Amino acid sequence: ISPDVGVVVRARAIAKRVNCDLAIIDKRRERASVSEVVNIIGEVSNKNCILIDDICDTAGTLTNAATALKNKNAKSVYAYITHGVLSDPAIERIEKSPIDKMIITDSILPRNDVINSDKIEILSIAPLIGEAIGRITDNRSVSSLFA
């Protein structure tokens, strides 16, 4: 699930790679940190949904999208976020939301409240970053790591 049109290309590539359907959240942003889900494009009823995004700051868009998916009878809602900034009130929003599990990377050092959340799992990308740095140092291809 793409939580907004800005992530559609990445979400489509992931959906193709894992052979699943794509849905898009059509949202309206009234001002910074305030968004409203206008429509869901695609079928989500009785499906396990995975929200894909590059960054999550206050979790407003993410939790609104999760609520909209559940209101359309999604079976479950997971989120994969590359960079979990998770500024206040993100943790509180996530804990109160219908998100079953949120996966973030350790690209940003997680605070204790993030580490202690039952809904958030941290996936280490340290080995990948280390390998990329090593390849750059040795003038080897980095793009093959992501093929």
Segments predicted by a language model, with ranges:
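PRPP-associated nucleotide enzymes
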Residues: 1-147
